[in-house]
């Protein structure tokens, strides 16, 4: 399959993406030198990152799970994508093994740094990339957002009070908003779970 044949909103497998772009999906940012692209994956099931959506814009967290993130490798590639000729493409995962193609994105503002917990729960600096779709991305299904919330809420029930309080305090109450049938705020499952225990 050619990159230009990808359809917005369609579901693709890991193998289809790998063969189309010429890169492996080892992380949330995957560079392909053969197609001069950067494949960005927002995995709502497994990721430790907390990307924030604002309709057709997303503030995407950079690569690096432990300690302060550095502006090197794929992070550098994305930060210089306005001038280096690399084209970023974004996929979302709501179910394991299913990658929904959202389209090409570009930086609409300068990357910035903020505090966010790492894989071990320690506070660290991450790079945030303000991205906007080159086209009008399709609204997502309401059920996809609800399924993610339910999955994260279920996981939050297994955390200790201390872990839950930490997660609730380290994230905003509202994680962003997405267009579904109407604009819907994404709730923070850790705040909800922590509030129910009080």
Where is each model-derived feature located?
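Compact mixed alphabeta submodule
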Residues: 94-154
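Short, surface-exposed, polar/charged, turn-prone segments marking secondary-structure boundaries
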Residues: 60, 66-71, 117-119, 132-136, ...
């Amino acid at each position: 399959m050619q990159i230009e044949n990808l359809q917005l909103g369609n579901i693709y497998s890991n193998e289809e993406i790998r063969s189309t772009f010429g890169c492996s999906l080892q992380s949330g940012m995957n560079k392909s030198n053969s197609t001069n692209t950067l494949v960005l994956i927002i995995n709502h099931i497994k990721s430790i990152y907390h990307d924030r959506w604002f309709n057709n814009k997303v503030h995407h967290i950079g690569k690096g799970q432990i300690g302060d993130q550095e502006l090197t490798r794929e992070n550098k590639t994305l930060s210089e994508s306005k001038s280096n000729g690399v084209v970023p493409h974004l996929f979302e995962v709501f179910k394991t093994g299913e990658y929904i193609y959202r389209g090409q994105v570009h930086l609409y503002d300068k990357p910035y740094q903020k505090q966010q917990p790492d894989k071990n729960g320690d506070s660290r600096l991450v790079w945030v990339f303000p991205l906007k779709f080159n086209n009008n991305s399709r609204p997502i299904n309401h059920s996809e957002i609800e399924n993610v919330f339910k999955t994260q809420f279920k996981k939050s029930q297994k955390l200790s009070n201390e872990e839950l309080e930490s997660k609730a305090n380290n994230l905003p109450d509202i994680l962003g908003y997405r267009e579904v049938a109407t604009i819907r705020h994404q709730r923070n499952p850790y705040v909800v779970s922590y509030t129910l225990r009080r």
